[in-house]
Every structure is written in C-alpha cells, then in structure tokens.
C-alpha cells in the first residue's frame, strides 16, 4: 500500500504545473548543464546561462581554472553571440562565491564584445575577490582570447639554446603552456558554432607531430583527438572540417585529413592510440634536437665550426652558447648537454 501511495504521488506530481521560470532556467545537477550545452547550438537559450553558471558553481565545477576552460569558453561565447543581452546575463550571473568569480571575469574578457572593458568596470564591484585580475585585463597585462597568439616554433639555434639549458621565451598565457585554452575554444564553438574557434584549434594540429616539446606534442595530440571525436559525434563539426581542409597549408592539411577519415569511419580510437604512442616514445627517447646534438658532437670539430660561424651572424653570445671555432669547448658542451 505504501508503495502504491508513493507511486501514485509520483504520477500525480508529474502532471502538476511547474513554475514557468523554474521550467525554463533551473538545473538540478552538473550533468543537466552539460546536456544543455551539448544541445545548445541546435536550440540556443541564452537566458539560461546565469542559471547554468550558478549550477556549476554549486557543484564546485569552477574551482579549478585548468579544468573549467570549456565552461569559460561557453559562457564567453554566449555573451559574445548576444551583445544586446550581455549586460542582463552578467547581472543575473552574479553574485558568485569568491572562488568562482574568476569565471565571470574571464568570460567577459573572452567574449569578444566591443564593450567588454566597460562591462568589466561596471561589474567590478560585484566581483571584489578578482579586483587585481580585472585590472590586469583592463590594462592589457592579461590578454583576451583573441589576443593570445599561437606559440611560434623555435628556430634551429633557439632549439640548441633550450637543449643546452637555456630557457625559451616565456609568455604569461600561451597555447603551449595553457592546455585549458583548447577547451575554451571548444566552449566558444558549442556556444554558437564559432568558426574562428575551430580555425584556432586547427592551427595547433601540426604540434601533433612535434619532436622537440612534450608540451606541444601533448596539446597537438589533444587537438587532433578532440577534433576527430567531435567530428564523429556532430555532423556540423565534420562538415566544417571538410569545408576547411582544401584551403589549409600542408602542415595542417595532412593531420586534418587523418581527422576527417577517422571521423567518417568512426575510428577515432585509432588516433588516440597513435598519439599516446608518440607521447610515450617522446618520454622514452627525448627531443630529436637533443639526439641530433649528440650526433653532431661526434661528427667532428669542422662541422661544429661551420655551425659556430653561422651562429655568429645572429649573435651567438645572446643565445648563451659557448662557441670556440675549431676548439673543444663547443664540442664538449654539446656532448655534455646531449647526455643529460
């Protein structure tokens, strides 16, 4: 009898009218938000963004910026696609707990809205825990998503400099140092089919074969796999990749063709296996430049001297490389660093 009563109440409750606002905006769990985001491009509901952000905050999904890049990109994309509603959406998104206010700040900065600075200033008092972060975006010390350039590949001499213990040029935020940016770009796409976001992901594809940086190889591998996986799941992504493929430079076209083939044949797991194998091999054998350094060190001082002469033209001293033409200093240094 008790079971019947509970079942009857459940059935009756199913037919009770829900409050209109709750039916439109509330999310019960983090998974509800993810499912909504997954369908958003087919049925945009920007008015639900504030409720989604608050639900994610309540589920502690925003505490780790490195794991919340997708949500940042999505929120930024929704704001950017709805400039006439952005002010209202931000107002309803706040307040947020101190630990989660960064998401609102970054979503505004990454939105691409012409008035994003005005919006940050206007709502700065409602995000007091991120006062310094806001100031850094306003004065340019922190870059917006569109301002972050793709890391340039180091030159041959810069590679040697790095392998000999020198530090590569560092950036506060870069695709090589911040893998969450890849998630952020996907979030922007899911918010409104942002073609530019996909293009930026494509520019990282050549890193899937990088032989000198484990960080780049890892991020390039992630780009290749997420492109294949999402293209296999979503027809719009696959169609966009096929449209872009013929116009890409060779360094992008070849891995993109692999992505399209894997998506068409539903064999994305193969790409994952191949990229994991490349990462494992890199961990075992190290940088190709470093291995080449070891080989060059044994070729003979004549070859080293040629390299030194060429390097002198671009200020070898500035690179921090010891170089004595015809002497043992360079050869010894190369052998030493290659062995590390």
Predicted regions and their residues:
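Non-catalytic all-alpha helical scaffold/repeat segments
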Residues: 23-340
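Hydrophobic alpha-helical segments
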Residues: 16-17, 96
């Amino acid at each position: 009898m008790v079971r019947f009563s509970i079942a009857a109440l459940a059935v009756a409750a199913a037919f009770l009218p829900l409050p209109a606002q709750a039916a439109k905006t509330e999310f019960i769990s983090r998974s509800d938000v993810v499912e909504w985001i997954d369908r958003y491009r087919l049925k945009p509901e920007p008015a639900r963004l504030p409720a989604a952000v608050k639900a994610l905050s309540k589920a502690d999904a925003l505490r780790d910026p490195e794991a919340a890049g997708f949500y940042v990109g999505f929120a930024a994309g929704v704001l950017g696609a709805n400039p006439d509603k952005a002010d209202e959406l931000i107002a309803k998104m706040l307040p947020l707990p101190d630990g989660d206010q960064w998401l609102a700040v970054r979503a505004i900065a990454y939105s691409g809205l012409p008035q994003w600075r005005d919006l940050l200033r206007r709502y700065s008092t409602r995000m007091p825990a991120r006062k310094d972060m806001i100031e850094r975006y306003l004065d340019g010390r922190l870059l917006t998503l569109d301002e972050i350039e793709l890391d340039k590949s180091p030159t041959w001499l810069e590679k040697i400099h790095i392998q000999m213990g020198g530090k590569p040029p560092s950036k506060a935020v870069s695709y090589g140092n911040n893998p969450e940016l890849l998630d952020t770009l996907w979030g922007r796409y899911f918010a409104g089919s942002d073609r530019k976001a996909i293009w930026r992901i494509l520019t990282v594809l050549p890193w899937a074969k990088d032989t000198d940086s484990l960080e780049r190889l890892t991020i390039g591998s992630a780009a290749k796999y997420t492109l294949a996986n999402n293209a296999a799941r979503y027809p719009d992504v696959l169609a966009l990749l096929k449209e872009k493929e013929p116009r890409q430079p060779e360094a992008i076209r070849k891995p993109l063709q692999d992505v399209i083939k894997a998506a068409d044949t539903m064999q994305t797991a193969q790409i994952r296996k191949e990229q994991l194998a490349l990462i494992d091999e890199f961990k075992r054998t190290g940088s190709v430049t470093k291995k080449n350094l070891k080989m060059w060190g044994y070729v003979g001082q004549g070859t080293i001297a040629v390299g030194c002469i060429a390097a002198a033209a671009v200020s070898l001293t500035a690179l921090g490389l010891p170089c004595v033409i015809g002497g043992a200093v360079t050869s010894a240094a190369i052998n030493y660093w290659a062995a590390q």
